[in-house]
């Protein structure tokens, strides 16, 4: 136990009682109502330390073995202050990240000589020991506010009780006393925000409506290619930079200049094929949809997530703590399967029963995810084409009296997809209508 005269810099307020007042840590979307501590980098100070103390980093004590890292400390008049942002997790806890080097607080799985766990600087991995619960508290007598950090289901509390010398007090987590810590211990766990830097946060785009399937205007009009298709923004989410791999930026630059990245979800009509089919003729056409393994692996590497076989989003450890916020912002569901969406190749036989040649263009709904920096630069994008929503437009569409007919459907390859169903034939494609195939039904529905 530290008294008011020890090297921790604790003031004469020893002996006062404290009452805890939990902060409002209800999970919120990353798109809206970010708490201030998730929008700014603050230098933390102990509330009862002498003026001039602030958060810093020190070389890890040489007596600690098998843990090559730097440890966080509260240091008097330090020349290299550390500024921290707290990224809000789905469950209301926080990842505490350092503006200078992009690393995070980590409760090291070793013990100091007083049975405390040191708080070290480490690359973000998503492990439990990097998650901290922040609770607001108030001095019972003065009413002055501060906050405390807890780990391991509130069985341990962040403390600055272990002094290396008269200038430096290491941060560590101490075991919670049965009811509440003695007041002299509580002051060692009381922190306040000091000076700050603003985080770099991109603006969220407005959502928009998806246009109808494009119509060809002549026999020579081959339709709209994917690169020229009009996109509709259906959702967007702010991604903490700690979960993003940006091949052109290191962790420090990401944290300073792209504290959050923007992930946009857009939809557009992706052209599968365009062909003139002679009157009363049948043609065989291959259709390629889904997403390739190369693209999926790229998404996993850069975002730590992938598109499931049901077109929902699946998250790995680094991103899973933010998955509810991300899917809510993107307006996309969580995947109900661990199977990755793969590439689907099908062979279709179409019959033109009209008395004239007709230009047909088939489109399927594309789901596009685009990662952007704060300045709007595109880092990368990933596209999955959804074969379950498709439609055909034709020219001329009058005086055509007979629609295009799908007479045969064969799956050539269906990688990693749990939906290997084929359409029941014959299937009529009415001009401009979207065929909607669900996972539950073999018989397609027609959008009216």
Swiss-Prot record:
One of its GO terms (molecular function) is toxin activity. Residues 199-448 are annotated as: Probable pore-forming domain. The keyword tRNA-binding does not apply. Residues 1-198 are annotated as: Beta-trefoil domain. Gene3D superfamilies: 2.80.10.50. Disulfide bonds join 67-161. One of its GO terms (biological process) is sporulation resulting in formation of a cellular spore. Keywords: Disulfide bond, Sporulation, Toxin, Virulence. Forms a heterodimer with BinA. This is Binary larvicide subunit BinB.
């Amino acid at each position: 136990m530290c008294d008011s005269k020890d090297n921790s810099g604790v003031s004469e307020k020893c002996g006062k009682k404290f009452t805890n007042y939990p902060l409002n840590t209800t999970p919120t979307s990353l798109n809206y109502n970010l708490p201030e501590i998730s929008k700014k980098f603050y230098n933390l100070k102990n509330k009862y330390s002498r003026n001039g103390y602030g958060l810093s980093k020190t070389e890890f004590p040489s007596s600690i073995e098998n843990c090559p890292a730097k440890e966080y400390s509260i240091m008097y008049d330090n020349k290299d202050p550390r500024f921290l942002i707290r990224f809000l997790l789905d469950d209301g806890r926080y990842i505490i990240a350092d503006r200078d080097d992009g690393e995070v607080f980590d409760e090291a799985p070793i013990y100091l000589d007083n049975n405390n766990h040191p708080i070290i600087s480490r690359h973000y991995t998503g492990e439990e020991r990097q998650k901290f619960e922040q609770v607001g508290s108030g001095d019972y007598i003065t009413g002055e506010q501060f906050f405390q950090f807890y780990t391991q289901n509130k069985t341990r509390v962040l403390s600055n009780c272990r002094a290396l010398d008269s200038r430096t007090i290491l941060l560590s987590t101490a075991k919670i006393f049965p009811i509440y810590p003695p007041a002299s211990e509580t002051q060692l766990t009381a922190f306040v925000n000091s000076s700050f830097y603003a985080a770099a946060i991109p603006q969220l785009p407005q959502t928009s409506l998806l246009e109808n399937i494009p119509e060809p205007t002549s026999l020579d009009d081959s339709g709209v290619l994917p690169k020229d298709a009009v996109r509709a923004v259906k959702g967007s989410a702010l991604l903490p930079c700690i979960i993003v791999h940006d091949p052109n930026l290191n962790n420090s630059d990401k944290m300073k200049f792209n504290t959050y990245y923007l992930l946009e979800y857009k939809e557009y009509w992706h052209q599968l094929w365009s062909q003139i089919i002679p009157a009363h003729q049948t043609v065989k056409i291959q259709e390629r949809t889904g997403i390739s393994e190369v693209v999926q692996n790229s998404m996993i590497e850069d975002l730590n997530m992938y598109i499931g076989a049901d077109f929902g989003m699946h998250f790995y450890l680094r991103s899973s703590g933010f998955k509810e916020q991300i899917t809510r912002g993107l307006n996309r569901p969580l995947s109900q399967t661990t199977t990755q969406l793969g590439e689907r190749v099908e062979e279709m036989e179409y019959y033109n029963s009209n008395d004239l040649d007709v230009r047909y263009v088939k489109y399927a709904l594309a789901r596009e995810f685009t990662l952007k920096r704060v300045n709007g630069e595109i880092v990368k994008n990933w596209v999955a084409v959804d074969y379950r929503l498709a439609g055909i437009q034709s020219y001329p569409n009058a005086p055509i009296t007979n629609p295009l007919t799908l007479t045969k459907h064969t799956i050539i390859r269906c990688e990693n997809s749990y939906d290997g169903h084929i359409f029941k034939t014959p299937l009529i494609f009415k001009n401009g209508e979207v065929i909607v195939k669900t996972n539950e039904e073999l018989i397609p529905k027609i959008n009216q």
